Amino acid sequence: MSISKNLNLPLALELAKTNLQAKYAGSIFGFLWSILNPLILFLTYLFAFKIILRIPWTHQDIGAFCLVIFFWHWLAQSLTESTSLVLGNKHLLSKVPVKLETLAIAAVLSNFAQFFIANILCILVISVTLGLTFNPILYFLAISLTLLLVIHFYTVLGSLNVFFRDIQHLVVNFLTPIFLLTPAIYDLKDIPKEALPIVWLNPLTSFVTIFKAAFKEIELHYLILSVSLAIGWIALMFLLHKVIQAKMLKQLLDAL
């Protein structure tokens, strides 16, 4: 109860609703646009790997890959939008006593709602057409951990971008390298041992691996390592958020 009151969750929900309404205002297709982008990306990769390169993917592989692409799209969209959290809401932060965490939760819920609805629809369609099976425990574990990470992405990157505007450009330019260093279109077992440390240094590798494990069998030691690293990355982002809150909050508000 105290956490809900402290973060003003009712306000966060209202802001998330407003964000969604504003995003699709005047759009004929509305919510369908949130499905179209990752779907086009999935079909492009499917054509390249399955048809041109003739990689022997099973129906389960194809279904898992489709859902991982949707998961990645959610992460990429959150990363891109996180840098504008403070600058895009400076009118609220400078005039209304609203916590940065409340704005972050609102933004996260807005993106998550689109991802989750689209993802559930895809799971249902793929399960019927391709016979996809999945582990709901790992699925919701991946989503829960990712939600915690993304909230701190918003508060940390959004705050730092006020002082260092290059961050927003760095995030956009590094999205493709980060994607290619994430085991989304390939499996961890296919990576040469000398290249594995580089892949594990990617913060998103562990989260994508846990999500992928919900739809595709992954070696147990990779799964345990992924969960451990995911918790570690969340803890690191939480500490960075606390440092910013303690050391830079006044300067942050003065800079708006």
Residue map of PLM features:
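Hydrophobic transmembrane alpha-helices and immediately adjacent juxtamembrane helices
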Residues: 1-256
